[in-house]
Design a protein with these regions (language model features):
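Cytochrome P450
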Residues: 1-396
Length: 396
């Protein structure tokens, strides 16, 4: 997402940095500290970043002042990205419709299928003696979960991944001039056909359910939900999965702890999301004049809320740059906060927990490939590894 530099508000006295200059690739802890140390409000590439925890949480909790709808309207998406591109009361309606399908109780019914898929993917990788954990595990599994939730055939997985990659790359272009939009049109057609099929032949999948009932989604809303899942629900889980497996590869004692006490996997997963939220920035636009730390932001000011920065701000014993394994699940904002808190957080936890558990059962000891340096591509909107080469003894 970009902001037109010519129309950004110019506010005197605000320190300015450049996003691409932050030292994020090798160590996000250092990068976020540079941002926090610059001041409570920092201008970067047309966006005003709020860096203090209280200010970020206040913005998340007050959509009447910090609008998600305005932020996503600025993208010019032809589809309403349900529910994130709406503010209350419209957003409240969508959450009421969708929340039951992503509750722990509902997801529990899907656990056997999702667990078996995790086992199949992990066993295929474990048999090789080495793998790229991103390509072999972290990329395919979330895509299969999406297809399962929407009642779509798993054979479409590789097509879905290709469409997802192409559409995300497309969204990063400032204009569509000279850009191949074929993948976006193909994904649009694929989801449209799926919606039409569900209207004719209802199943037990989520897509079928949201298309029926007194307050069902219309076709455009269902398409927007599908697009949001593909654009925001796949790479985020992929990235968190990579971060989890990287940390385990670097920490033999942690592997032992989790194998001996699988209940601690839940603590570990929350720590990974706290430290390495894959979508670390939340965009908002002000709806009226707002004053933050003495800085007056006029209406329509583009604002970014750095979730990862406040999770590591040192304001308490657990808000550190290290994994805290004290047996407790600690509060954090890796999934956002306020009414727009991540709808799929329970699903993401389930996916991450399944992969970590099944991997440790089959590959108790593993290490990073010699000479490989764990850096993420930066600058980027989603933080995650491109590759993760692991070495271990084959269990074939």
């Amino acid at each position: 997402m970009s902001v037109d530099q010519d129309r950004r508000p110019v506010i005197e006295g605000v320190p300015e940095l450049h996003w691409a200059s932050l030292p994020m690739a090798a160590d996000r802890g250092i990068g976020w500290k540079v941002l926090r140390d610059a001041g409570p409000v920092v201008l970067m590439d047309g966006w005003y970043y709020l860096t203090r925890r209280d200010d970020v949480l206040a913005a998340l909790r007050h959509p009447e002042l910090f609008s998600s709808k305005k932020a996503f309207d600025s993208l010019g998406s032809p589809l309403p990205l349900v529910p994130i591109a709406f503010d209350p009361p419209e957003h409240t309606r969508f959450r009421k419709i969708l929340q039951p399908f992503f509750s722990p109780h509902t997801l529990k019914d899907m656990l056997p299928s999702l667990q078996q898929q995790a086992i199949d993917i992990v066993e295929a990788a474990a048999a090789k003696g080495e793998c790229d954990a991103m390509a072999d595990i972290a990329i395919p599994y979330p895509s299969q979960v999406f297809l399962t939730l929407f009642g779509l055939p798993l054979k479409d997985r590789d097509r879905l991944i290709a469409w997802k990659d192409a559409v995300i790359a497309l969204s990063e272009h400032p204009t569509l001039e000279g850009v191949d939009t074929t993948p976006a049109l193909e994904l649009f057609t694929y989801l449209t056909e799926a919606i039409n099929e569900r209207r004719q032949d209802k199943g037990n999948d989520i897509l079928s359910q949201v298309l029926t009932g007194e307050d069902a989604l219309n076709d455009a809303e269902a398409l927007g939900l599908g697009f949001l899942f593909v654009l925001a629900g796949l790479d985020t889980v992929t990235s968190a999965m990579g971060s989890a497996l990287l940390e385990l590869a670097r920490n033999p004692q942690l592997r032992t702890t989790l194998r001996e006490d699988p209940d601690q996997v839940a603590v570990f997963i929350e720590e990974i999301v706290r430290l390495e939220p894959p979508a670390p920035l939340v965009p908002r636009f002000t709806t009226q004049t707002v004053t933050i730390a003495g800085v007056t932001l006029p209406p329509d000011t583009p604002v970014r809320l750095p979730l990862a920065a406040i999770n590591r701000d040192g304001s308490d014993d657990i808000s550190t740059d290290d994994v805290v394994m004290d047996g407790k699940v600690h509060r954090h904002w890796g999934y956002g906060g306020g009414p727009h808190r991540c709808l799929g957080s329970h699903l993401a936890r389930m996916e991450l927990t399944l992969i970590v558990n099944e991997w440790l059962k089959r590959v108790p000891e593993f290490e990073l490939a010699p000479g490989w340096i764990p850096e993420i591509p930066f600058p980027a909107n989603t933080f995650g590894l491109e590759t993760l080469p692991l070495r271990y003894r084959s269990n074939r």
